[in-house]
Every structure is written in structure tokens, then in C-alpha cells.
């Protein structure tokens, strides 16, 4: 099995997977979105490509230093071959750029972003890591090998980034369209030849790292990550002379505009469903209360009975939910039919109300302690990048933002506690609420939000008082059928995750699901061809992402 072109069970693969989100910020940069669309200003492209001269020179010198540090003759030979390939590319760069359809400027001045990476790489290759001179502390030739490993660790992510990003872009190209001016450049970095070079570099990193200590492997990991971040900085620093559709926050007028973010909670923000979390709180509380029968009036059932009841409720919900979805699907997929979708979702609304009534009647929510809920919420595992995105969005000072969480969750206190740190208490929560008596839940629920139509009503109530000019933009982020109407009503609907129920339901009613990156590439083409920055709500098109890094890169940039 492979991921991003990297084989399993290897150090290079481990690092790539761990820091792959950094590549998202490069891919979603104005530079690469414009390049992928074929509309990137040629001067901007040449300004970037001209920096290859400085990168290649730094690679060549670093390989030379790494070869001196390598202890094994086979490793020395492998490094020498890599250096030879770099020197050949440096020598033939003018010809290569000409084959891509461009001509390098006579003078290639190093920019600051390039200098930061090349200085970092050459310092690493010279044995200076984290501000300390490593070579001065080495006593044997064998120990010098780690400097060679450090050097390759600082080079390999640069190659993998190019291989990965261009392979993401290539499927978006029309094979019959010869007008895409960057097609040859993309094909060069998608080639088997470049993948072979990347793989050889990663294999060398793995081989050089075999004998290293855990502490030394940690150093390589830090160097690998630092190299990735410097690449992000490099592409973020590319001067853009054309209008671009991203980052979204750059497009908005900082004075007149407002960006309103709506978001689901369960499995969009969280790694686990909130009902399962509340079930676990109830069971743990019951186990604590079992020895003391004085609390039985609060818990009402033993922990074993409680676990069994939760299991029955959960199984029944899952089975009947799928049957409900199947029953409301049209026999054939057709054109986008919002009205028909609304009618179908009324049946789902009735199902959700009955399911909630069963939960209340079962008594499983009785006896929950508010402090337990808040403590669990504060420790709740959110999706990677979710908290960081919201922390950045609420602190952004150059435009107005408003953030709302719309959730079926039975307990608003759980959501508020999950966002209680990092200035996130400004997020407005719309959900159901548990009923308490002296901080102990009675088992009842204040049912504020039980259906897709109620979610839509809250959404519309929030946005109805705002003017409809282009500078007021709504973004909805969700991942279940409950979010479908809001996703379609928002200016931009972003589907997080891979809910098969959402896909099946949407597709049968004519909803299109488009990967966000490819949607941005098309939007950039439209903008360059005289289109506007405006996003069209109720278009029947939703945009899919697999990480919060994509959402952050799209809305805020790097």
C-alpha cells in the first residue's frame, strides 16, 4: 500500500504522513491554484522558477558535504549519484525551462524566502543543527553518518512535495487542451523519472537513519518539518500580480464585508459522536455511584444495565437510520431538486424526533453531573486542525467574522466546554440542552434542534438581517444529511469527511460533490476569463475536503 507515492514501513513515509498537512497550504496557495488553472502570470512563474538555480546549487553543495560525512561506500556512491543529477539539472536548466515554453531571466536574484531555506540546508549539511555545531562533538567517522542523514532529511521533503502536488494537479488537466501553458512543467514533476529521484532520496534517508538513536531520529523529524514549513513560506511569499480566488479572507472587503462561518459539531469538529461521549460519561458516573445506593435515585440503573441500554438504543438508531435514508431516496437520480429534497428530509426529521424521545424515555441521560460534562468537553479530542482554525478565525482583525455551531448534540454544555479555551468562547452554540436539577441531569432534553429543517431555520434566522451584497459571505461546514439543506443554502457549502448517507441522498437529488481544490481551480479560470469573485448559493454544488487544513488554507491561507 502507498500514500502520496511513499511506501509503507519507512521513516520518510512516517514523516510525510505526519506533516502532509503542510503540503495543503502550498497546494492551496494563490501560486499553485493559479498555476493549476493555467492562468498564472508568466512573470510570477519565471520569478519562482529562477530560484531553482539557488536551490540546486545548495542541493549540490549539501550533497558534497553529506558524502564526506557518510561512512559506508555504498551510501557515498548513492549521494554522489544524487549530486550528479542535481549538477546536470543545474547545467541544463536553461534548456529545460525552454522546453517548458519559457526563458529564464539573465539575472536570478535570490529572494528572502529562498535564502531562508538554502541557509537552513547548508547549515544542516555543515553540521550546525538547532544552533549547535554537531560535527565538533563527533568522535568517530561512524558518528558523522548522522550529519549525512540530517542533510538528506532536509532535502527529501522538497522533492516529495513537488511529486505529490503535481500528481494532484495532473488529473485536473484536459488531455486534449494544448493551451495550458504549465502543462509541460507539471508533466516533468509527475514523470516516472522524477518519482524515481524522489524515491531514491527517501530510500537513502531510511538507510542512513537505521543506526541512529531515538534522539537523533527526533532531530531528523524536526529538520524534515522545518524544511516543509520553509517551503510553505517560499510559495506564500511568491508575489502575485493577478486577482485570485484565495485565500477567501483576502477577497473580502475588510470594512464592508462580513464572513459568517457555520459548522456542525459531531464528527465535523469532533473525532467521536457526542452521544457516545455522553454515554461514556453516564456509565462512568454510574460505576462510581453503584456502591452508594443513596445515588441510585439519580442514576436509576446499574452501570451494566446502562451500558446494555445504550447499546440497544445505538444499534436500533443505526439500523433504522439507514432504513429511513433508503426509504426517502428517489428511485433514480435526477436534476438538482431542492424542493424534493426538503420534502424527503421531513421524514428524516420525524425519525430523529422519535429517536430522541426513546432516549429520554429510557432514562439513560438521567444523573449526569454538569461538572463531569464540562471536564470531558474541555478534554474532548477535536479533529486535527479544527481548534487551530477557529482560534485563527476569531482573532483575525482585518475583517469581521461571526462563527456559529449548529448541532443535534443533546448537550450544549459539552460543545461550549470543548470550545472554552483559546478565546473560542465567542463561538455561538445552537443545540439541544439537558435539563438539570442542582447540576444533575433529570434525563430530559430541551429539544431546540432535531431536524435538517430546524437547522435551516436557525441558519436563515441568523443571515436574514444581513444585506445580500457580495461582501457578506456565508460558509457552512458539515458532514451529515442533517447539514444538507444548510450546506446548499450557504454561499459556500463544505462537506467534511465521507458520510455515505450524505453522498447517496445528495446525489439522488442532483447535488454535485466537487473536491474543493478542483473547484477553486475552475473558479480561478472563471475569474481570469472575466468572471467575478461571487459564489453562487443554491447552485446544487458542494465542495468536499478531507482535512481542516484544507478549510484553513482556503479561508485564511498559510
Language-model features: locations:
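Terminal targeting/low-complexity segments that flank the catalytic cores of oxidoreductases
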Residues: 1-55, 59, 68-72, 169-255
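Eukaryotic N-terminal low-complexity, Ser/Thr- and Lys/Arg-rich leader segments
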Residues: 1-17, 21, 133-140, 239-258, ...
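Active-site-proximal alpha-helical scaffolds that flank and shape metal-associated catalytic sites
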Residues: 6, 16, 24, 46, ...
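Glycine/small-residue-rich interface belts in oligomeric ring/scaffold proteins
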Residues: 48-51, 55-66, 297-305, 310
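Acidic active-site catalytic centers that drive phospho-/nucleotidyl reactions
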Residues: 52, 264-266, 479, 483
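Active-site nucleophile-adjacent alpha helix/oxyanion-hole segment immediately C-terminal to the catalytic cysteine
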Residues: 61-64, 69-70, 271-278
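C-terminal cap/substrate-recognition subdomain and adjoining C-terminal extension
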Residues: 185-190, 245-256, 376-558
